[in-house]
């Protein structure tokens, strides 16, 4: 603290820049096309088998095991209208949020609709499990630390989301959190 009181304006600015860069490194997400392809082909097949196994009446039927996860997901509403909106600009999806599965289900539904993937903020708790973290880190999720209350952190987070929108990355925002 003594050092801060006697620091020059330039030194203070450098320190502020370092803190902002550290916050940005904590927040930034990644998107890997290979992981996306795996997530939209292999994983849905496995989930479909699990969902079918939960229905004892369907276990005896080989055709029910071959059905895809898309048979378990219903997409209703103005899908064509959403596609037309995408032609006009960046898509921002703002649904209600009730569980940690919401971003997974919405991401898969967006894929089934033939739309490009969405970037989205996710709480740090979703990065605790190594398997979940791998997918979150490679499917466009950026980290949101809800415990950080510093104004600078919130500004860096807001700027990250703003720049993503300005660069035409489609986004998913859950205003209510979980």
Question: What positions do the PLM features span?
Answer:
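Structural beta-strand/beta-sheet cores of well-ordered domains, especially the beta-sheet scaffolds
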Residues: 71, 89-91, 116-124, 140, ...
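Catalytic core segments in nucleotide and nucleic-acid processing enzymes
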Residues: 143-159, 171
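Glycine-rich, histidine-containing beta strand-loop boundary motifs that form or position
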Residues: 95-97, 107, 121-124, 175-177
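Membrane-anchoring hydrophobic helices of lipid-metabolizing enzymes
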Residues: 1-92, 97-108, 128, 133-139, ...
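Acidic, metal-coordinating catalytic cores used for nucleic-acid/nucleotide bond scission
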Residues: 126, 150-153, 178
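Metal-dependent catalytic core segments for phosphate chemistry
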Residues: 108-112, 116-148
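Conserved Motif II region of HX4D acyltransferases
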Residues: 89-96, 157-178
């Amino acid at each position: 603290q003594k050092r801060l009181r006697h620091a020059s304006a330039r030194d203070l600015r450098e320190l502020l820049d370092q803190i902002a860069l550290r916050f940005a490194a904590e927040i930034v997400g990644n998107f890997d096309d290979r992981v996306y392809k795996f997530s939209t082909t292999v994983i849905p097949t496995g989930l479909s088998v699990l969902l079918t196994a939960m229905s004892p009446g369907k276990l005896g039927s080989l055709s029910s095991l071959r059905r895809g996860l898309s048979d378990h997901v219903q997409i209703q509403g103005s899908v064509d209208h959403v596609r037309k909106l995408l032609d006009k600009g960046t898509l921002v999806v703002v649904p209600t949020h009730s569980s940690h599965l919401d971003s997974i289900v919405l991401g898969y539904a967006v894929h089934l609709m033939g739309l490009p993937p969405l970037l989205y903020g996710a709480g740090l708790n979703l990065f605790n499990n190594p398997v979940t973290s791998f997918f979150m880190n490679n499917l466009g999720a950026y980290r949101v630390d809800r415990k950080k209350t510093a104004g600078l952190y919130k500004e860096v987070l807001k700027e990250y989301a703003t720049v993503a929108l300005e660069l035409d990355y489609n986004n998913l925002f859950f205003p209510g959190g979980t």
